[in-house]
Curated annotation (Swiss-Prot):
Inducers of expression: Expressed in both exponential and stationary phase in rich medium; expression is higher in stationary phase (at protein level).
Additional comment: Encoded antisense to yqgC.
Taxonomic placement: Bacteria, Pseudomonadati, Pseudomonadota, Gammaproteobacteria, Enterobacterales
Name by which UniProt lists this protein: Protein YqgG
Pfam families per record: YqgG
Length: 47
């Protein structure tokens, strides 16, 4: 996960690195949300 962020930041520069970071963070949040929902059926998160 962190490796992907570092690769995105290293290959991009300036303002282009910010959207890449946001996109990576969004995918990470979705991944954790999915894992959390699968582990705990009471979570009920839906994005």
């Amino acid at each position: 996960m962190n490796r992907c962020l570092l690769l995105n930041l290293s290959h991009r520069s300036g303002e282009d690195s910010f959207p890449a970071l946001c996109i990576s963070a969004l995918h990470t949040c979705r991944c954790y949300t999915h894992l959390g929902a699968s582990q705990d059926s009471r979570a009920g998160y839906s994005y």
